[in-house]
Amino acid sequence: MISGSIDRYSPLALCVALAAVAATFLASPVRAATDSETRTTAPFHAVAFAGSWTVDVKVGGENSVVIEGKKDLIAKVKTEVVDGELRVGIDNGLLSFFSHQDLDGLTAHITVPELTGFALRGSGKADIGGLNGGKTAFELDGSGNLNAKGKLDTLGLVVNGSGTVDLSGLETAKASVTINGSGDATIDPRETLAAVINGSGQVAYVHEGVKVTSVIHGSGMVEKK
């Protein structure tokens, strides 16, 4: 009886069965270990990041910084406040705050009482919410994506490269926008818009009745969305 059972499993059948088990194992997703770490910093009112970040910024509340992602990457992240600006970069023993080392998989959760400035360099993505009055200067260098919502009195924006900025949900009285390269920006000024484009960039505004002044060098354009 035992002999007959063994005979039914030929070498070919065993190979097929083992291959099926291996394929199932390889197809199963392998989840990398993730962790989070809260950083203690001096007070700050501006933020600067570089690399392939996902950054969530909440305006309104006490300063806080939480880094989330793979443990080995979190350990390399350096946070420091210089003249009221929170800088986040990779600590590799060199001048690294604005290194474009790949940080894919990391997310920074930031809370700030007020946001006077925000800079994103590289190919990261930033979402900012809760802006409420005052003046904020934004800068996007590279191919990243920047989104912000809320309300401001005055908005300043500089885009260097091919990045995309969506501020259609950020109402502002006055806006000043400069694009160097092929980037594009959508904004919502209600009174005035001053735009400068050097290259093929595009600026779109969403509200009627805005007084627009523009200087364009190249094939760029300013238009009502």
Enumerate the predicted regions with their spans.
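Short helix-to-loop capping/linker segments positioned immediately adjacent to catalytic or ligand/cofactor-binding
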Residues: G124-I128, G144-N147, S162-V165
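Short, recurring structural edge motifs at helix starts
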Residues: A33-D35, S123, S143, S182, ...
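Short, surface-exposed interaction patches in beta-rich subdomains
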Residues: A148-K225
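Bacterial N-terminal signal peptides
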Residues: A13-A27
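Acidic (Asp/Glu) and glycine-rich low-complexity loops/linkers
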Residues: I2-Y9, S28-R121, D127-E139, K149-G156, ...
